[in-house]
Amino acid sequence: MPGYEWIGDKERDQVNQVFDTGILFRYEFKEERKGVYKVREFEEKFATFNGVGYAQAVTSGSTALKVALAALGIKPGDEVITQGFTFIATFEAIIEAGAIPIPAEIDDTLNLDPYDFEKKITPRTKAVIPVHMLGSPARIREIIEIAKKNGLKVLEDTAQALGASVDGRRVGSLGDAGTFSFDFYKTITTGEGGMVITNDKDTYIRASEYADHGHDHNPAVGRALEGRSFLGFNYRMTEMQGAVGLAQLERLPEILDVQKKNQEKIRNLLANMKGVQLRSLPAGGVDSHTHVCFFLPDSQKAADFHKKITSAGVSAIYFKNNLWHFFHNWEHLLSKSTAWPGSFPFCETFCDTDIDYTSDMLPKTEQYLSRTIVLPISLKLTEAGIDKICGVLESAGKTLL
């Protein structure tokens, strides 16, 4: 994902406006900041881009998940279903909320399988987190329909799919809330940072207060006199991050256009290559063009194909062996090793769920990932670079497939 690839004068100009005021904190200092509220402006423009009413900036995509879970009322002992192919932060945020993550299978979108999600629902299930992995939407319509039927909250983890859409609506905007990441390897970056979006005012207010020690942000009084109705924590974004985010958000339409152009030729080649199957897009789905993901006939061919193209200088990922994105490889989660005594929240005091995490509990996910190759798409790809990638892929296909 591009993020860090385009950093320059736009970002520098925005940050300098913050330095000119001397106010790096997002709240207070009305006179000194001279009308410069970078985080607030970033939130407003990000909400507009995604077609929602509200956005709350936070310190990371990981904390965005935690804040959103708190805002949605997830509590200790609740079960939250999510997919076994995701960055580990999705599971960590559920555990941080005191809830129990229930792993579910993926399908040929490389995202949550709606049918397995439905099978995993129990009376303790309170939410589902579909993750739009590697720039492409999950089958979000089906997931939302199942969730509504069972009275569950839908939290879209959109860290890797900013700009993707389903039926003309941005992913992240379709569920009860959506979260985004702005770390160095996301579509836009603030170095570190995240966002929670929602169309529900009460969810937004709870997120806003929880992310700022419970402050109710009453404009009629000074910050020191603001009220609070519950305990929160500090997940505030700084004005410098907000400034960089504004500049990056301004670039986003061009980023998506360039990514699409760079992706197209590679994708078309693979779509017509014998033995190759592109990942599926749900009906009405448009991806964010950050990757090309494809399946090979079996795991051995995938491993050989990956070895051949990477040895020829093509950047590619074989996620079956990835230590941070596949449930199968998280030995600390499999052993329920948390930082708290008694392995909270899995201890009997809080948890009625007797779940045994095993490395073989998601066979369908393992089967898909063992056959999957992922090609990151750089903003800086030249025509010559694209032609080189296509040539290497074509050669590997002729030799191995």
Predicted regions span which residues?
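Conserved PLP-binding active-site segment of the aspartate aminotransferase-like
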Residues: 280-283, 289-299, 319-339, 371-382
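Short, conserved charged micro-motifs
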Residues: 299-305, 382-387
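Active-site region of PLP-dependent enzymes
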Residues: 29, 34, 161-167, 174-291
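Conserved PLP cofactor-binding pocket of PLP-dependent enzymes
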Residues: 215-223, 265-269, 306-372
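PLP-dependent aminotransferase-like
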Residues: 70-158, 165
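Short amphipathic alpha-helices in soluble, non-transmembrane regions
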Residues: 207, 303-312, 389-393
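Conserved PLP-binding active-site segment in aminotransferase class I/II-type PLP enzymes
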Residues: 1-71, 75, 96, 121, ...
